A protein has these predicted regions:
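Short histidine-centered catalytic/ligand-binding loop motif
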Residues: 105-111
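Short hydrophobic/aromatic beta-strand or adjacent loop that forms the aromatic wall/cage
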Residues: 25, 104, 176
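Short beta-strand segments and strand-loop junctions that repeat across beta-rich extracellular domains
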Residues: 175-184
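Short strand-connecting beta-turns/loops that link adjacent beta-strands
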Residues: 102, 184-185
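Basic, often amphipathic N-terminal segments
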Residues: 1-91, 112-173, 188-212
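Short, basic/glycine-rich phosphate-binding loops at helix/coil junctions
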Residues: 98-104
């Protein structure tokens, strides 16, 4: 096993957290100016429709979410490094708003194909993301950027009445993915940034991955 993985595992054992589960998100984030613009939209929605959830969630496009024991995190991150480095940067274009009746309002993603293809690459490490039969990774099939979710009926009805007529347009270059982690009772925090390097894909088998 290589020295990097050994150090990570030793650190987790020392803190006593590696046997506890955590929630993870792998996301794409807009550049700072667009991020701030979308954050303002979310803040306004939260104020106008008394929706604290819109204020809490930060702007991102989810690729996969999963729950897993923290002992598996080093292996998950190594698998993501190996798969994501094969990707090349691509443009994401967003236009206007959409909804999942009757609970979520989001920004439409126009350029979905490359995001879906990115998810396919990320799936290469799914065996490390499955905690048990009741906790399997959820890979996104309909990319979107959430403004507000878990809406009450009145929040959705009034919110969608307004946002279905609003205009929005934004674009950014996706050149990395960000892994976020949340332990019980905590907020999500970044744990690693995976840069799209357009490197030649290597055949990865479990023994090679861990240098066993």
């Amino acid at each position: 096993m290589n020295q990097y993985i050994m150090k990570q595992l030793a650190s987790e054992v020392a803190t006593g957290n590696n046997q506890l589960p955590a929630e993870y998100l792998l996301v794409l984030q807009p550049h700072e100016a667009l991020w701030n613009e979308i954050k303002f939209i979310k803040e306004k929605f939260a104020t106008d429709f008394d929706c604290a959830m819109a204020r809490i969630g930060l702007p991102h496009i989810t690729l996969v979410r999963f729950k897993q024991y923290q002992a598996a995190e080093v292996r998950i991150r190594q698998a993501l490094r190996n798969s994501i480095k094969t990707l090349q940067p691509f443009k994401i274009e967003m236009k206007d708003f959409g909804s999942f009746p009757s609970h979520t309002i989001y920004i439409n993603i126009v350029s979905k194909v490359q995001i879906v293809n990115t998810v396919k690459v990320v799936r290469q490490g799914q065996r490390f993301m499955k905690m048990d039969k009741d906790n399997k990774p959820h890979f996104i099939t309909e990319p979107h950027l959430t403004i507000a979710r878990k809406l009450l009926p009145w929040q959705y009805e009034k919110g969608w009445l307004e946002y279905s007529h609003k205009d929005f347009h934004g674009r950014f270059i996706a050149d990395h993915a960000l892994l976020l982690k949340r332990r019980q009772g905590e907020k999500y925090r970044p744990v690693e940034k995976f840069v799209f390097q357009n490197e030649k894909e290597e055949e990865i088998v479990q023994g090679d991955l861990f240098n066993l």
